């Protein structure tokens, strides 16, 4: 992955979220994706904070968009590796987030670990 590819991924991902376009958001993810986030526990009541599979991810993201109708992200930094990125962004409330995303051979997100400030 190059710097430009990583930024392109980040910009497209943020644009999909800011449009609240669930289909465009999910297009970034593998069917067998795993996402871990403390917000999963908060919104879905899953104690380990883990969502497995694209359909479960769809339900989680839908719940998030319903809970936060004013949701907007601003991407401010992208780190990249050979098959991973870290997207650093803030939301409409100023909460800063860093999401580590491991990419599959096809370039889709296979694993996510979300980390939040404050």
Question: Across the structure, where does each feature detected by a protein language model lie?
Answer:
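Short, low-complexity N-terminal intrinsically disordered segments enriched in polar/charged residues
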Residues: 1-27, 31
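A solvent-exposed, acidic/Ser-Thr-rich amphipathic alpha-helical stretch
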Residues: 3, 24, 30-76
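A generic alpha-helix structural signal
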Residues: 10, 58-61, 113
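Hydrophobic pocket/interface hotspot
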Residues: 13, 25, 33, 53, ...
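A beta-strand edge to alpha-helix "cap/lid" segment located at domain peripheries
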Residues: 65-118
């Amino acid at each position: 992955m190059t710097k430009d590819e990583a930024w392109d991924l980040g910009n497209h991902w943020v644009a999909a979220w800011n449009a609240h376009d669930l289909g465009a958001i999910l297009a970034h993810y593998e069917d067998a994706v795993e996402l871990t986030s403390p917000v999963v526990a908060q919104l879905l009541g899953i104690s380990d904070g883990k969502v497995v599979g694209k359909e479960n991810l769809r339900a989680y993201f839908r719940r998030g968009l319903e809970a936060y109708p004013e949701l907007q992200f601003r991407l401010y930094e992208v780190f990249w590796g050979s098959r991973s990125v870290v997207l650093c962004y803030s939301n409409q409330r100023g909460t800063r987030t860093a999401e580590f995303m491991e990419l599959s051979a096809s370039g889709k997100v296979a694993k996510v670990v979300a980390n939040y400030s404050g």
